C-alpha cells in the first residue's frame, strides 16, 4: 500500500509539472502576443507622446529625438529591441510622467500600494461574502436567502460608479477625512477598500449559494441525512466544504482583477497607485509608461489564472491535472 501511495504521489507531481509547463508555455505566448500588439498600436499614436516639450520643438529636433530613441527603425527591429531590453529588466524611460525616469522604478514604487489595497479589499469581501453565501445556501428560500438576494441584486443593478460616489460623499463626512489620500491614517483606507470589495462580496455570496444548493441535492447529502446527521453539520462539514472547491479557483484571479480594476477608485481618492498612474499616462500620451503598465497587468492576469487552476486541483484530490487540461 505504501509503495502504491508513493507511486500515486509521484505520478501526481509529474502531472502537475507537465500541466505547469504547458500553461506557462501558453502564457508566455499569450503575453508575447498581447504586449507586441499593444506595442504596435502605440506606434500609431502621435509622436508627442515621447516628448515633454513637444510644442516648443522644431521638426529637426523631433526627428533627432525619434532617431535617438530608435523610433525611426523598422517596426520588427523595434519589437526585437523592446523584448531584448525587457528580458534584461529595462522597460525604457518615461518622457512625460517623469522625464528620463526609469519605467521599472516607477512601477516598483506604485505597485505595492495597489497590492496592499487589493489585499485589504479581498479579505473584506471574503469575510463578508462567504458567510453571506453560506447562510443563503443553508436557509434557501427563507428570510436570510431573500435578504441576501436583494442585496446582491442591488449591488449588481446599480452602476459601480454610482455607489462609489455615494460612499465617498457620505463616508468622507462620517469619517471626517479629506479627499487627499493619506496612507499613514487608517481612516483613508476604509472608503476605497469598501468600494473595491462590494463587487466581490456579491460575487462570492451568489456563487457560494448556488454551489451549496447544487451540492445539497447530491447522494452523499441524502446518505448523511439518512444516518441522522444534523442539518448544521451537513451544511458545514459536507456541503460548504465541497461548494468552496470551485469557488477557490476564482480567488487569485479575483484578487488580481481587483488590483488591476482599481483604476477609477484610485483616481477618485487620489491614491498614488497603479490605477492613477495608468490614467495619467494615457492622458499625457506617455507611451513608454503605458506599454510597461500593460506588460505588468498582462503578467498579473496570467499568473492569477494559473494560480486559480492550481488551487482548485490541489484542494480537491479528485480532480486530476489531466482532466483539468482536457477540460480546456
Language model segments and positions:
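Hydrophobic alpha-helical transmembrane segments of membrane transport/permease proteins
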Residues: 31-81, 171, 175-188
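Cytoplasmic-entry segments and transmembrane alpha-helices of multi-pass inner-membrane transporters
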Residues: 17-26, 132-168
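Charged, compositionally biased N-terminal leader segments and the immediate start
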Residues: 15-41
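Hydrophobic membrane-targeting alpha-helices
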Residues: 36, 40, 44, 135, ...
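An internal, D/E-rich "acidic patch" concept
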Residues: 71-128
Amino acid at each position: 500500500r505504501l509503495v502504491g501511495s508513493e507511486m500515486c504521489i509521484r505520478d501526481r507531481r509529474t502531472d502537475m509539472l507537465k500541466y505547469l509547463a504547458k500553461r506557462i508555455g501558453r502564457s508566455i505566448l499569450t503575453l508575447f502576443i498581447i504586449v507586441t500588439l499593444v506595442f504596435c498600436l502605440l506606434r500609431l499614436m502621435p509622436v508627442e507622446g515621447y516628448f515633454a516639450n513637444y510644442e516648443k520643438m522644431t521638426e529637426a529636433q523631433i526627428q533627432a529625438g525619434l532617431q535617438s530613441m530608435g523610433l525611426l527603425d523598422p517596426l520588427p527591429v523595434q519589437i526585437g529591441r523592446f523584448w531584448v531590453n525587457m528580458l534584461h529588466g529595462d522597460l525604457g524611460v518615461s518622457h512625460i510622467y517623469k522625464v528620463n525616469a526609469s519605467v521599472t522604478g516607477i512601477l516598483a514604487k506604485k505597485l505595492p500600494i495597489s497590492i496592499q489595497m487589493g489585499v485589504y479589499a479581498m479579505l473584506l469581501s471574503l469575510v463578508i461574502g462567504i458567510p453571506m453565501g453560506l447562510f443563503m445556501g443553508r436557509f434557501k428560500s427563507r428570510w436570510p436567502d431573500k435578504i441576501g438576494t436583494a442585496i446582491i441584486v442591488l449591488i449588481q443593478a446599480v452602476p459601480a460608479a454610482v455607489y462609489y460616489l455615494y460612499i465617498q460623499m457620505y463616508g468622507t463626512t462620517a469619517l471626517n477625512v479629506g479627499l487627499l489620500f493619506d496612507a499613514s491614517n487608517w481612516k483613508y483606507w476604509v472608503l476605497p477598500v469598501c468600494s473595491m470589495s462590494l463587487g466581490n462580496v456579491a460575487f462570492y455570496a451568489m456563487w457560494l449559494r448556488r454551489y451549496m444548493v447544487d451540492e445539497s441535492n447530491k447522494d452523499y447529502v441524502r446518505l448523511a441525512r439518512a444516518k441522522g446527521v444534523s442539518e448544521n453539520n451537513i451544511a458545514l462539514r459536507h456541503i460548504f466544504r465541497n461548494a468552496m472547491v470551485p469557488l477557490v479557483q476564482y480567488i487569485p484571479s479575483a484578487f488580481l482583477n481587483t488590483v488591476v480594476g482599481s483604476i477609477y477608485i484610485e483616481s477618485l481618492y487620489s491614491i498614488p497607485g497603479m490605477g492613477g498612474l495608468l490614467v495619467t499616462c494615457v492622458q499625457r500620451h506617455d507611451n513608454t509608461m503605458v506599454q510597461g503598465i500593460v506588460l505588468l497587468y498582462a503578467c498579473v492576469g496570467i499568473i492569477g489564472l494559473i494560480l486559480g487552476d492550481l488551487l482548485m486541483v490541489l484542494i480537491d484530490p479528485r480532480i486530476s491535472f489531466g482532466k483539468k487540461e482536457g477540460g480546456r
